[in-house]
Regions:
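Glycine-rich acyl-CoA binding loop
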Residues: 74-77
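Surface-exposed, gly/pro-biased binding rims or lids
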Residues: 114
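Conserved beta-strand-loop-alpha-helix junction that forms the acyl-donor binding cleft
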Residues: 98-108
Length: 147
């Protein structure tokens, strides 16, 4: 693959947090960064990553970024659906979580498309105020399937 847009190079995004996590616990690497690749050009146009392994309640949070010229073309939907379906192969995953700035209307529309439920807000020390959305794994399977 080529990376002409320099995804995760000029702005490290999740790598700043994920690399130290993997150094501390290499087994957690499977939950981290996946490239989003434009098939026709074999170019990286974004990335997605879980924030870590499922927590003690089985909740699994995800984040993603798509380069601006490729937004609103379905790539985020495809990437999230693929990641969540992959995560369902691990029985410890009970709930999917998605947090987003209340100002990020496109991302809120995306998570509403999937049918996630708004759970409230939290204050993130880096990102500031975030809306919290969740969907139980069994509800996800009922709506979207597992493969």
């Amino acid at each position: 693959f080529s990376n002409p847009l320099r995804v995760l190079i000029d702005f490290q995004g999740p790598l700043a947090w994920r690399v130290p996590q993997v150094k501390a616990d290499p087994a957690c690497n499977k939950w981290f960064v996946r490239w989003i690749v434009l098939k026709e050009k074999q170019e990286i146009i974004g990335s997605t990553s879980f924030h870590g392994a499922p927590d003690s309640d089985g909740a699994l949070e995800i984040g993603l970024g798509i380069e601006s010229e490729y937004q609103n073309q379905g790539f985020a939907k495809e990437a999230l659906l693929g990641m969540w379906r992959w995560a369902l192969t691990f029985p410890e995953v009970q709930t999917f979580r998605y947090t987003v700035s209340p100002d990020n209307l496109a991302s809120i529309a995306l998570i509403n498309y999937f049918g996630f439920e708004y759970k409230g807000q939290q204050m993130d020390e880096i990102d500031g105020a975030e809306n919290i959305y969740e969907m139980r794994a069994v509800d996800f399977i009922a709506k979207w399937g597992s493969n």
